[in-house]
Amino acid sequence: MYLLNDKVAHELKKPFGKVYKELPSIEGKVVSIGDVTTKHLLSNGIIPNLSILDFKTKRNIPVNIPHKFKTIFEVENPQGCISDEAIERIKYLSTIHDRDMALIIKGEEDLLTIPVIKYFPEDTSVIYGQPDEGMVLLKITDELKQKIEKLLKDMEER
């Protein structure tokens, strides 16, 4: 399990990609992280390969996503950490070439962008919310994977 600390929290305030109010067209493998982001994609006809959500926004405001996912997985991931269970499930899901899968988080999904970038293949599009700004769209690259490895080394491991 990795625990968030002040140093990494400061780094994570900066988006990993470009921030959009409306996303451009997206091709290839797509992972969405966050309820509002996933809802926006689905309402625009974009079905991610994997959606990671907890049915809340801003920690406690319920979000209704009227979509029936093809396959659903659940894991626990407490606030401020990346649980071993979440890491193992994301690692497994990164090997599946399917669409319309959901990973439902009991706890908080905010930090799970980190293992998604670590385990999903290069050129995967990852979209997550940047609170009060929009959605961040990034393509996984080797350079980004190296940055994530450094962040993980800077986190407290238990």
From Swiss-Prot:
GTP binds at D35, V36, D54, K56, E109, D132. Keywords: Coenzyme A biosynthesis, GTP-binding, Kinase, Nucleotide-binding, Transferase. It catalyses: 3'-dephospho-CoA + GTP = GDP + CoA + H(+). GO terms for biological process: coenzyme A biosynthetic process. Pfam families: DUF359. GO terms for molecular function: GTP binding; kinase activity. Pathway: Cofactor biosynthesis; coenzyme A biosynthesis. Its EC number is 2.7.1.237. InterPro entries: GTP-dep_dephospho-CoA_kin. Belongs to the GTP-dependent DPCK family. Catalyzes the GTP-dependent phosphorylation of the 3'-hydroxyl group of dephosphocoenzyme A to form coenzyme A (CoA). This is GTP-dependent dephospho-CoA kinase.
